[in-house]
């Protein structure tokens, strides 16, 4: 630290006496002073390229290295959150708003609610929704490791087991949702299930650890919006990250739904997408339930955590299971305490 202090003081003192620096700054100011010509459209590209060339020549003349800000690739702008939505709008020539709601693991449910609200309010007939996560970045994995919520033994992370932690994954999920009557009028047929209700709320309690009150309130809100009684829910897909939060979430589900509701979880199969996980999991639920089946968690009885083992019969553990009923539900709980709950049912013939 002391060396850095002395170095900065040395440079600050001598830079005032550098005639070359003053000459460099005068020439740089002249380069940057050039504005766009009278015809903006035809001039702007030429001016940008001319300035870039002049700066490179100026640096070479004075032996000056490239400035740090000139070493940054402009393609970094594609990391702005709404860029995937913008790209889809360009590919599909979609002129509606392109936004990127940020709700961590509850991101897909949040985007779904925004789309349904827009459709029900008459602001849209169709919406393209989705989430995308990059491949796991060392900073993301490292922060999860430091928070003690990532699996560290090299084995597949399974919900409801030893609470060893989750594992981070990347990918994307995109849906097209819309007014059913309108799309049927265009000759389209629906996939999956009909969305009856979506609710989102916040625990307002802890960044990582979920509460009981927040998710339970979210479930009740979704049931009310969907006009569905808990007894009607044939299956419930859980967030279940293979962390101690699984126990809290299981208690939440058992406090609302009857023992006949079949419980599933998907992160052992898909991994834990930071925003997209809800999309993957909801897609799996919809595509299976629409065919009358539930895909298993892939759990043997002796793998289930001892404290949860007495509730193991409620889990779809290791075999494909046929299911009766018409209503399915899904829960996601995101970092920051944000919850999203989706209630769906089979389409009417």
Where are these regions (language model features)?
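Conserved small-residue
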Residues: 88, 108, 115, 144, ...
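Glycine-/small-residue-rich "gating" segment that lines the acyl/pantetheine channel
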Residues: 113, 117, 134-185, 317-323
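Short beta-strand-to-turn element immediately C-terminal to the catalytic PLP-Schiff-base lysine
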Residues: 150, 175-179, 254, 342-347
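Conserved catalytic cysteine-centered active-site region
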Residues: 1-114, 143-168, 251-280
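Condensing-enzyme catalytic core mediating Claisen C-C bond formation in acyl metabolism
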Residues: 154-228, 232-235, 348-349
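Stable alpha-helical structural segments in soluble proteins, enriched in small hydrophobic residues
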Residues: 111, 218-229, 256, 281, ...
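Flexible, low-complexity linker/loop segments at domain and module junctions
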Residues: 191, 226, 230-232, 311-349
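Acyl-CoA/ACP chain-elongation machinery
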Residues: 123-147, 151-164, 198-212, 238-247, ...
């Amino acid at each position: 630290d002391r060396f850095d202090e002395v170095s900065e003081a040395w440079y600050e003192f001598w830079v005032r006496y550098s005639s070359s620096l003053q000459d460099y700054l005068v020439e740089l100011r002249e380069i940057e002073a050039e504005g766009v010509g009278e015809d903006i459209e035809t001039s702007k590209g030429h001016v940008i390229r001319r300035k870039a060339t002049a700066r490179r020549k100026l640096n070479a003349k004075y032996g000056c290295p490239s400035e740090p800000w000139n070493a940054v690739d402009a393609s970094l702008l594609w990391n702005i959150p709404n860029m995937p939505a913008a790209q889809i709008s360009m590919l599909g020539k979609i002129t509606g708003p392109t936004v990127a709601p940020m709700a961590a693991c509850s991101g897909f449910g949040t985007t779904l609610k925004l789309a349904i609200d827009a459709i029900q309010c008459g602001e849209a007939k169709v919406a393209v929704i989705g989430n995308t996560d990059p491949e796991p970045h060392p900073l993301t994995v490292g922060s999860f490791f430091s928070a003690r919520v990532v699996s560290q033994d090299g084995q597949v992370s399974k919900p409801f087991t030893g609470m060893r932690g989750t594992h981070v994954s990347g990918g994307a999920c995109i849906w097209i949702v819309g007014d059913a009557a309108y799309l049927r009028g265009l000759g389209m047929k629906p996939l999956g299930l009909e969305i009856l209700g979506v609710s989102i709320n916040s625990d307002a309690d802890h960044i990582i650890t979920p509460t009981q009150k927040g998710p339970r309130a979210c479930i009740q809100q979704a049931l009310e919006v969907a006009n569905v009684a808990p007894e009607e829910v044939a299956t419930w897909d859980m967030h279940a990250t293979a962390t101690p939060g699984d126990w809290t979430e299981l208690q939440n589900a058992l406090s609302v739904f009857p023992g006949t509701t079949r419980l599933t979880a998907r992160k052992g199969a898909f991994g834990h997408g930071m925003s997209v996980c809800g999309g993957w999991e909801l897609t799996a639920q919809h595509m299976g339930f629409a065919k009358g089946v539930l895909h298993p968690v892939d759990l043997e009885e002796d793998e289930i955590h001892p404290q949860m083992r007495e509730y193991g019969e409620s889990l779809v553990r290791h075999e494909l299971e046929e299911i009766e009923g018409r209503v399915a539900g899904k829960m996601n709980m995101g970092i920051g305490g944000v919850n999203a709950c989706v209630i769906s049912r089979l389409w009417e013939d």
